[in-house]
Curated annotation (Swiss-Prot):
Pfam families: DUF4599, FAM75. Residues 241-260 have a biased composition (Pro residues). Keywords: Differentiation, Glycoprotein, Membrane, Spermatogenesis, Transmembrane, Transmembrane helix. It is found in: Membrane. May play a role in spermatogenesis. The lineage of its organism: Eukaryota, Metazoa, Chordata, Craniata, Vertebrata. GO terms for cellular component: membrane. It is a single-pass membrane protein. It comes from Homo sapiens (Human). Belongs to the SPATA31 family. Residues 664-681, 906-915, 1148-1165 have a biased composition (Polar residues). This is Spermatogenesis-associated protein 31E1. The chain crosses the membrane at residues 64-84. PANTHER family: ACROSOME-SPECIFIC PROTEIN, SPERMATOGENESIS-ASSOCIATED PROTEIN 31E1.
Length: 1445
């Protein structure tokens, strides 16, 4: 055969077999190639395919491959970064829009931020890629070593089955390194060796491994064998298992890994058991630590990595500590336990130093691993905490820097802290393991936390050591530890080997009882002996519960339950807790059966009862039954409240550390109605008190939910001075006295477990209801209602004696008129009054309308006049003096009970001498409204006349000058300009203050607190008014003293309508002397007339406020405009405070006349209850209050007679004076019916005649003087001439009186303000000057005045029916407005009709002098002023007609 050239490859020259190179031969046929040649050629063609793989797998090519991979990855990353940084220019803004200078900056900053963010992302991605590349590199290295024969330590032994091995995979596969996988292949790689730090903890000496460190491998040390704790193989960790250290004293049930959330359910299903202690040694070398770092670094669960290192360190550290220095020793064989490891052949690890690892490198690796694991742990924890913000850590997180070193780098083994023993010393079963794993799995906030519970262990009775038992280590148990039943013999723990920490024996002083852990409650597992654990912070703090305990050696420490119970509570639901209650009771019975030794009594200063980590129901106690009680109590509390970690039992459940009571202090009422025996006296005292207080305080937050309701019964053994610890409900109202302070204030809010919320709510409601009922029974009105804006401003004095306010009777239909504007504190008082008046008027117009006539007077006078029981009348807003139903005797009680009406109203309604220390504020509208009903009930004795006025005043309000200084006392009198009857309410004030019996009557009607009540009551007593008035007057005469309140005008008027009462209250019985005549006139009036008048007054009840301009300096600057219907007084000083609709046409002249006569009438304005300072007539003020009050025993008598005379003359002048004020007369004439006017005229005439017969003309001159003083409203010329004419004819006086009495509604409508002011001033002056002696007149005089008034009414009735009626009424109003006519004329606008109807005597005779010309003059003015009768005047007129009929 010729030489053939076989091509071996591209560009490759073949070799001739002979070795000679032959030029390419000429083409030959292919037949020359034999089959062998083809085969050879084919074989050689395959060689290039093998060479790359060989090159790739060649160890020498590994660096090149690594470089290539890294370079490619880096290139990709850089390219990605470049692409991110490359960006197009932003689009230019629209042409029509200018870009601000800041926009480019913002865009640039935004770009820079985006670049930074993208760069960071790229860096992260790069790091991940690098990690993956490194992992791949490690994988390649291991593979190459296997192929190249390197790493003999990793080659499996000849006959050893590998079984489960850990096969690392790239991180991208989302499978953590070390995931357990079945690999039957004998060429499978062994898992990475255990971390280098573990090697550092081993005793010095060569380290050998019997086989690949896997689930079948065990360690044997060249030195003495070390006891190791069993560990499980979590799925997330490289399958590295540290063999447990067997215990020579017997097997022990395996325990779960520490309760970490990351560990739950992450087990390989293998049960950890001790490893055989004897096995052939196999000299193996640990693999390089780098693989360990990579595996750990790429682990999906760094927390587990950290835990593994910690566990290993703990295991080895404990073993080295127990042995001191490691000595060569073989572990005992435990074939039965070795079977769990799947290796029938025992194997051992020879402990020794890792000489192949440099100490510095090892230390660095350890630091890096620890930092990385800690960082990831914190990151995961923060992430989970953010996911569960409501859950907070119960203890301090484990800090790797504060723990003892995990690994001992030095050649000499260092002694780690001796193992701690668990307080409960119980063995935990698999079920408990599972439960606790689930617990920590459910509590992400507890991840990898070193939750430790402080356990006080004393090796001797005097020494105490605080040890922290990490809860995550509590699960580990020592093999061979005998099980111990939970009993009082906890201190009798079996002796441990010398190399193990002996369980600490409990001192006899310790309470043997201890709350069983929740796990025990759930699983009824046995208590386990102490378990070694890492020593944590030395301070005795239960980080799980946050309760600090004293380290003092003076007090014996107690075994405190570990924190795992409290940690589990957040996840335990009520039903679950209920299910485990039986076990709790059983365990508590078993554990707490032993008696407790005597404990010191003193309580540690650092005791924090709030955070006492004691399970309710498991309180330490010597007696089992009591513990049963406590257990049941705790059960109910747990059912209703929740976990015990936050629940504080009642008093007894929380005991200070040094104060364990032998018996529970008390038991919850809902659980057991009977109280258990109280704590021994040794534990009584301050400490106990504090504990009780703390218990209730802590349980207070549950009381609202009905969670905890406990009532501490009397404990004879405890300090009585400790005070009650029961929950006080609704004790905020300290104003209530007497009956209001009842046992219900101390009723403990208890809730039964059946329905605690409902029970608690019912208790609260019952308490509140009882309180309100008590207030209602006592006549107290709720604070929000009882106080008007005036009362809110003035302090309500509390009477020294426990005076009960009278009951509040509602007026007409049980409705009490309450001023609800008090809440509007931001409003000015004047504005508030205006609003109230408008509201009331609106109600009257739309609701009442003309139905006032249908109203029937109520006979409130239920008893004789009596002296007020208390010298000082404090009119409480809630006082029921308002009620008309109350008898007169009760009125003084009200007066005594009532706080002062006005701010500074220090008036005393005592019969001795009521003194008004300050300006009297207008009574609250509620009082007015309430008083209105008893309009007819005025103090009959002293205020017979005022009664008549109240009827007339009923509808009208009273305006009260802020102050009326009578006898040096500032009175805030209110001029009650009621429907035609501006009758002064002097009677109440003077009578009540002056005389005992008389004083109380007067005080009722006139007293600032309840001036109108007595009058109203008297007025309401229609049938027996005269007799009662006479009796009252007599009584007043007997005990009457000159009241400091001189003139209370309008009080009597409001008595009938309630406005009278209000006026009296506001005026405070001021100037009762001036009022008596008016009051007597009211008394003299017929019941029907009084009733009608009262209705009219209540309807109209308008208080005219004189303009400040018109007011004279002598007059009080602010007259309260009061609506009789509402009883509201407006402090405004201007007429325009009231709307035009509210003001009557006669109000303007009234205001004028009032302003004119106001000076003179300051003290004498009885009809209107208008109390002026009396600056107009100083003499009037000074003698007024004392004179009028002192000489006049009964205000009514004095007022009737004296006012009659005084009013005659003043009215004469008034009429003349009123001639100038036709507006008032016209308004009155139009407003009142002819019949009413005639009646009023007749009454006035009669009264004037009587007065003239008696020769009571001085008032006229006095009034004339007053008129001269008041040029605005009254013209002395006309007033004088008319008075003269009236005096000559005698009719004008009657007419004036009629305008006063018969036209109370009429005059009230026409010239309420003018006449009221004039009358008040004139009456005050008359009372001071001349009527003072006449106050002593008895009811006979009143009757006589009554007859006079009636006669006077009859005279002017004709005129009133016709046009003359209007004229005369106008004249009378003018007279009333005039200083002389004012005594009764000023009230005349308000009271004239009421007075006529009630008592003609009410309108003083001074009006008789009014000449017909005066009325005529007034008529045109009235017509011009009003143009027509006011709607309210029309109603008043209709009322008058009824009265006349």
């Amino acid at each position: 055969m010729g030489n053939l050239v076989i091509p071996l490859g591209k560009g490759r020259a073949g070799r001739v077999e002979s070795g000679q190179r032959i030029p390419p031969p000429a083409p030959r046929p292919s037949v020359e190639c034999t089959g062998d040649d083809i085969a050879l050629q084919m074989e050689k063609m395959l060689f290039p395919l093998k060479s790359p793989s060989a090159t790739w797998l060649s160890p020498s090519s590994t660096p090149w491959m690594m470089d290539f991979i890294l370079t490619s990855v880096c290139g990709l990353v850089l390219l990605f970064l470049l692409l991110l940084y490359v960006h197009s220019d932003p689009p230019s803004p629209p042409p029509g829009r200018k870009r601000s200078s800041r926009e480019p900056q913002r865009e640039r900053s935004g770009r820079s931020r985006s670049r930074k963010i993208s760069a960071l992302k790229a860096c992260r991605i790069l790091l991940r890629e690098l990690e993956e590349t490194r992992d791949l590199n490690y994988l390649l290295e291991s593979h190459l070593r296997k192929l190249a024969g390197e790493g003999s330590s990793h080659l499996p032994l000849g006959g050893d089955p590998l079984g489960d091995v850990c096969k690392p995979v790239p991180a991208k596969a989302h499978q953590p390194h070390g995931k357990c996988m079945q690999d039957p292949s004998p060429a499978s790689l062994s898992p990475p060796a255990p971390p280098a730090p573990l090697a550092s903890t081993l005793s010095p000496g060569p380290m050998t491994f019997s086989e690949p460190f896997g689930p079948h491998s065990t360690l044997s040390a060249s030195g003495p064998p070390e006891p190791l704790l069993p560990l499980k193989c979590p799925a997330t960790q490289p399958h590295v298992v540290f063999p447990p250290s067997p215990q020579p004293h017997g097997p022990l049930a395996s325990s779960p890994p520490p309760p970490d959330s990351s560990l739950a359910g992450l087990q390989c299903g293998s049960t950890t058991c001790p490893v055989p202690q004897s096995s052939p040694l196999h000299n193996q070398v640990l693999p390089p630590p780098t693989r360990v770092i990579s595996g750990l670094g790429c682990s999906s669960d760094p927390i587990w990595d950290l835990y593994c290192w910690r566990e290993a360190a703990t295991t080895w550290g404990l073993s080295t500590y127990s042995h001191g220095k490691s000595q060569p020793r073989h572990l005992p064989d435990h074939t039965s336990e070795a079977s769990f490891w799947g290796d029938p052949t025992p194997k051992h690890m020879e402990v020794g130093g890792c000489t192949f690892i440099h100490p510095d490198v090892q230390k660095l690796l350890e630091t890096l691993i620890a930092k990385r694991a800690l960082m990831k742990m914190w990151q995961e924890k923060e992430r989970k905490r953010a996911d569960h913000p409501h859950m907070t850590s119960l203890g301090k997180e484990w800090d790797i820097t504060t723990l003892n070193p995990f690994w001992n780098v030095s050649t000499q083994p260092q002694q780690l802290p001796r193992p701690q023993q668990v307080s409960d010393a119980t063995t935990v079963g698999n079920h408990l393991q599972q439960k606790r794993s689930q617990l920590f799995w459910d509590l992400p906030s507890l991840n990898s936390e070193s939750l430790a519970t402080t356990v006080w262990v004393s090796r001797n009775p005097s020494s105490q050591n605080a040890h922290s038992v990490p809860l995550d280590k509590a699960s580990t148990s020592l093999p061979g530890e005998p099980e111990v039943e939970a009993s009082s013999q906890l201190s009798q723990a079996p002796p441990q080997p010398h190399h193990m920490a002996q369980p600490q024996h409990f001192t006899p002083a310790w309470p043997q009882s201890q709350p069983p852990p929740l796990a025990e409650i759930q699983t009824q597992a046995h208590l386990s002996p102490p378990v070694p654990s890492l020593g944590c912070s030395s301070p005795p703090q239960i980080r799980g519960c946050g309760a600090s305990y004293p380290t003092s050696q003076e007090r014996t420490q107690s075994v405190i339950p570990t924190g795992k119970e409290y940690l589990e509570w957040p996840l335990k639901k009520r039903p679950k807790w209920k299910r485990v209650l039986p076990s709790l009771l059983k365990k508590s019975q078993a554990v707490l059966s032993q008696p407790t030794a005597h404990l010191p009594q003193e309580r540690p200063a650092s005791w924090s009862p709030k955070s006492a980590p004691i399970l309710p129901g498991v309180v330490t106690s010597p007696e089992l039954p009591e513990h049963w009680w406590q257990g049941r109590n705790a059960i109910h509390q747990e059912q209703s409240c929740g976990p015990p970690s936050r629940l504080q039992a009642s008093g007894d459940l929380l005991q200070p550390d040094g104060e364990f009571p032998g018996r529970p202090q008390s038991q919850a009422e809902d659980t057991q109605q009977a109280l258990l025996p109280s704590q021994p006296s040794d534990f009584a005292g301050k400490g106990r008190k504090d504990v009780q207080k703390t218990g209730f305080r802590s349980s207070g937050r549950f009381s609202d939910k009905g969670c905890l309701g406990s009532k501490l019964g009397p404990d004879p053994s405890r300090d009585q001075g400790s005070g009650r610890t029961s929950v006080k409900a609704l004790d905020e109202d300290k104003e209530a006295e007497g009956d209001l302070r009842r046992s219900w204030k101390y009723q403990s809010v208890s809730s039964t477990p059946r329905d605690p919320d409902k029970e608690h709510l019912e208790n609260k409601l019952q308490i509140h209801l009882a309180r309100k009922v008590g207030e209602i029974k006592e006549g107290w009105i709720p604070m929000p209602v009882r106080r008007s804006w005036l009362m809110a401003k003035c302090a309500v004095p509390k009477s020294d004696t426990h005076r009960k306010p009278g009951k509040l009777a509602s007026w007409r239909g049980g409705k009490a008129h309450v001023n609800t504007s008090q809440e509007l504190s931001f409003l000015h008082p004047c504005t508030q009054q205006i609003l109230e008046v408008h509201l009331v008027r609106f109600c009257v117009r739309h609701s009442w309308g003309t139905d006032l006539q249908s109203l029937e007077p109520i006979n409130v006078w239920s008893g004789e006049a009596q002296a007020p029981p208390f010298p000082q009348s404090t009119f409480t807003p809630w006082a029921s003096w308002v009620s008309r139903v109350e008898s007169v005797p009760k009125v003084p009680i009200f007066l005594g009970k009532r706080p002062q009406n006005g701010p500074g109203d220090n008036r005393t309604t005592s019969k001795s001498v009521p003194t008004v220390s300050g300006p009297l504020a207008a009574p609250p509208p509620e009082q007015e409204g309430v008083q209105r009903p008893p309009r007819g009930s005025q103090s009959a004795d002293t205020h017979g006349r005022s009664e008549a006025f109240p009827t007339g005043h009923k509808g009208r309000g009273c305006s009260q000058p802020p102050t009326c200084s009578l006898v040096g006392r500032t009175w805030q009198s209110r001029t009650v300009l009621e429907s035609g009857k501006p009758k002064p309410r002097l009677e109440g004030s003077m009578g009540s203050e002056m005389a005992g019996n008389e004083a109380w009557l007067e005080s009722e009607s006139m007293s600032p607190g309840d001036p109108c009540s007595s009058r109203a009551l008297q007025v309401l007593s229609i049938g027996s008014q005269w007799a009662r008035a006479e009796d009252a007057l007599q009584a007043l005469k007997v005990g009457e003293k000159p009241p400091t309140w001189e003139v209370t005008l309008g009080a009597s008027v409001r008595a009938s309508s309630g406005s009278v009462q209000e006026d009296l209250r506001s005026t405070g019985a001021l100037g009762t002397t001036g009022n008596p005549s008016a009051s007597s006139v009211c008394v003299a009036q017929d019941p029907e007339q009084l009733h009608l008048k009262a209705q009219v007054v209540s309807e109209i009840a308008l208080i005219v406020q004189v303009d400040s301009e018109e007011q004279l300096p002598g007059r009080a600057p602010g007259i309260l405009l009061q609506d009789g219907a509402t009883g509201l007084c407006l402090p405004g000083r201007h007429m325009d405070m009231l709307t035009a609709a509210d003001r009557l046409p006669t109000q303007a002249p009234l205001s004028t006349s009032q302003s004119v006569s106001g000076k003179n009438m300051t003290a004498s304005q009885g009809p209107c209850a208008l109390l002026w300072k009396g600056g107009d007539s100083p003499g009037q003020q000074e003698p007024g209050s004392p004179k009028a009050k002192a000489p006049q025993k009964s205000q009514k008598t004095l007022g009737c007679a004296d006012k009659g005379e005084a009013h005659r003359r003043p009215r004469t002048g008034e009429q003349g004076h009123r001639s100038k004020g036709p507006r008032t007369s016209e308004a009155s004439g139009r407003s009142h019916p002819a019949q009413a006017r005639e009646i009023g005229d007749k009454q006035e005439r009669k009264y004037n005649q009587l007065q003239l017969e008696k020769g009571q003309t001085p008032p006229e001159s006095h009034f004339q003087r007053k008129i001269s003083h008041h040029p605005q409203g009254l013209h002395p010329r006309k007033g004088g001439t008319r008075w003269e004419d009236v005096l000559q004819k005698g009719k004008p006086g009657a007419d004036a009186f009629q305008s006063w009495g018969s036209g109370p509604p009429r005059q009230f409508m026409d010239c309420m303000a003018d006449k009221a002011w004039t009358i008040s001033r004139v009456v005050g002056q008359i009372l001071v000057d001349k009527l003072g002696l006449q106050w002593g007149r008895g009811p006979s005089e009143v009757n006589r005045h009554k007859g006079d008034f009636r006669a006077q009414e009859n005279v002017p009735s004709c005129c009133h029916r016709g046009h003359c009626h209007q004229e005369r009424s106008r004249e009378m109003r003018a007279l009333a407005c005039s200083p002389k006519a004012t005594p009764k004329g000023h009230h005349c606008p308000v009271k004239n009709r009421g007075i006529r109807d009630r008592d003609s005597s009410w309108a003083p005779p001074p009006r008789e002098p009014v000449s017909p010309a005066g009325p005529h003059h007034h008529r045109p003015r009235m017509a011009s002023t009003s143009g027509g009768p006011h709607p309210q005047l029309q109603e008043l007129m209709s009322a008058q007609r009824c009265l006349a009929s």
